[in-house]
Amino acid sequence: MNIGGSLTQVLLIEDSSQIGHARRTAQKLAEDNGFDATDAGRVALVATELASNVLKHAGRGELHLRILPGSSANGIEILAVDRAQGFDLQACMTDGFSTGGTQGIGLGAVSRQAEVFDVHTDSRGTVLLARLYPRASKAADLRIGISQHSLHNDPACGDVWHLAFDGANLSALVIDGLGHGEEAERAARAGEKAFALAPFASPVYLLEDIHQAMTGTRGGALAIAQFDGHLGTLRFTGIGNIGGSLISADKSRGLASHPGIVGGQYRKAQPFDYAHVNGHLLIMYSDGLQSRWNLHDYPGLVYRHPAVIAAVLHRDFCRGRDDVTVLVVALEAAHG
């Protein structure tokens, strides 16, 4: 199964009129992706409560929406993101308790409506995750997280990500086309198309194919990570400034790349192999994200859902002057 890259849809929540807009937007997204009236109603309910809680306890924030492509059915991801002081999660899981101290259905009820529910909250803010799938589909959740945003919400994004699954194996791609806008997107999409044809090929040969596909475009930076779930190994190949990290509960290590421009010039493409990575998080990110973050500065975050981790990193470390992509994969669960 292949999953092609797409942007995160962002809805500002700054006044009560935007709650209804969030509900309608989420419900339509669900209906357009095969949810029946009952399941789409669950999506609408969750979007309403999450947007309401953002407004009540934080004053302002965002909902991030994403389609979750699946082999049996698509899902809908809703993330509520804010920068307010954290709240008492245990109290908020009680039915009828709102994070704003007013009457609400409670996050406990939200968690029952969603197939996947997770949260990270501290003094820097809160990220709440709800993933919903059609109840009849019994779709399995993929332990991956994506946060991708274009500069100034431009429809064109020079960053591209792509994931391929083959049983217990995974191959992940991130490309950052030089600059931003339509020409950067054209360069990155050309590389993505070549990658999608043979995502599990030898990375040296795969990179050559991508380089040829991107020749004549602006070119860009690239990283490919290939995970073997049976052996518990990761092979990482990078050209340019796509960041990569392997993170466990108590340590992290950066993944090495070579200088150059794919579609332009680079000297070599040596893959680097990493053993015993089952149970680790793989994080790949474009240079729209600052590199000075440390996941262990956020107690407990390493144990949260990858989608929560991606949203926290984007919230706190986005540079704000380029397209940005954050891809997080829990490697032990990389199954299609």
Regions found by a protein language model. Name each.
Residues 1-45, 145-164, 336:
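Bergerat-fold GHKL ATPase/HATPase_c domain
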Residues 37-64, 209:
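Conserved ATP-binding N-box helix of the HATPase_c
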Residues 85, 177-185, 288-293:
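Short acidic, Gly/Ser-rich segments with clustered Asp/Glu that frequently serve as metal-coordination loops
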Residues 141-158, 207-215, 240-273, 277, ...:
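PP2C/PPM family metal-dependent serine/threonine protein phosphatase catalytic domain
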